Amino acid sequence: MKAFRVNAIGARNVASASRKVGAKLIHMSTDDVFDGQGNEPLNEFDTATPDTIFGKSKLAGENFVRELNPKHLIVRSSWVYAKEGSCFVNSVIRQAKEGGVIQVAAEQYSSPTSAKVLADFVMKMIDANEYGIYHASCEGCCSRVEAAEEILRCMGQDPTGRIEEISAEAGKNSPRRTDLQNLMMKVTGIYQMPDWKDAMRDYIQELRG
């Protein structure tokens, strides 16, 4: 169970070590702690009910952090993308450059979130000395198909006939909606996440130089 060794036991070890030295712990988590069977955005007070091994391991990590270090900030986000590493957005960009049909998972809905924006939010939270669980995803909800279409448009390409829906990942419910409501962020007034389309446009413009 590699997922539990990394996401649960790893988080436990870091939480324990950070408490011993009196350090605040910032723990990054995911929308996958929810099963995606609802029809509304999920806020910090909704019960986490993961339906995948990954989601269960991430929730276990959250629980260890909450139990072992009271000075914690847990940040949940969704469909995070950045220049480095593999992610859904970069996969679509690569396929778009290669031409042909772009394959995306069917009936999955959430909010693509820029790692750059997410990092800016975390820095604001550090400065504000906030604790607890916060959702931090770009505003709005879309399907993976809609996200792929928007990526193509941002690249100056016509998405018509370019997207092929394929079966959802094994072990995940379908349809699946896990877009996060940034309720605590709005209550505290600390930060305002941008609309996912605006953040996507900025990201692709930055890639294109």
Segment roles from a protein language model:
Residues 1, 9, 28-52:
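Active-site "gating" loop of Rossmann-like NAD(P)-dependent oxidoreductase/epimerase domains
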Residues 11-14, 62, 122:
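Conserved internal alpha-helix within the Rossmann fold of NAD(P)-dependent oxidoreductases
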Residues 25-31, 75-77:
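SDR active-site strand-loop-helix element
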Residues 63-110, 117, 123:
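NAD(P)-dependent short-chain dehydrogenase/reductase
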Residues 121, 128-171, 176-177, 183:
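Mid/C-terminal beta-alpha module of Rossmann-like enzyme folds, strongest
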Residues 176-209:
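C-terminal amphipathic/interface module of NAD(P)-dependent oxidoreductases
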